Amino acid sequence: MPKYGYDGPFGSNLKKEHYTSEKEVRIIQLSNIGEDGWRDENTKFTTFEHLSAISRSEVKPGDVVIAKMMPAGRAILCPNSDLKYVLSSDAVKFVLPDGICNEYILNAINSSVFREQVYDNVQGVTRVRTSLQKLRTYLVPIPPIKEQLRIVSKVNELFSQLDMIEKSLQA
């Protein structure tokens, strides 16, 4: 998916001076990209004006957002809300074309098969990370849309069953 990936602004394009206490544009940070999905913590914002300067890093609801580090490769879907969102420099986004289900890609990216590709090619020692260029090269099987939807439905069904089993064991 080479032409569908975008990285966050270079660090110097989103500095502390660009942050605001006004709840204008939510900055998606590593702490928001959880193993189990979106984490609504560590809220930071920038201005609508600054968003216009880094507009290619804007994230829309349903876009796939991938952490570049700690651990590299985990992914979430941007939440559906009235807020505007922008990537931090530690994340990338995939804007998917028609015919590709964002939940299917999310599950594929969060799979051990994809993560192994990421971990085999990370760089750094203390801050292990990947890059958009590397993420663009990893393989994800993309079946026809009907099969993608069927896979997503089955995965959701199985996770629901696991949640019910977990709750019954805690009771």
Regions found by a protein language model. Give the residues of each.
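A short glycine-rich beta-alpha junction/loop motif
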Residues: 84-92, 100-103, 123-145
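Feature representing long, continuous alpha-helical segments
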Residues: 60, 103-107, 116, 133, ...
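Cytochrome P450 core scaffold surrounding the K-helix E-X-X-R motif
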Residues: 37-42
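Low-complexity, Lys/Gly-biased intrinsically disordered segments
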Residues: 1-36, 52-54, 123, 127
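A short beta-sheet element
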Residues: 29-30, 48-110
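Non-catalytic DNA-recognition/assembly elements of restriction-modification systems
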Residues: 1-11, 141-171
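Short glycine-enriched, charge-decorated loop/helix-capping segments at active-site entrances
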Residues: 43-47
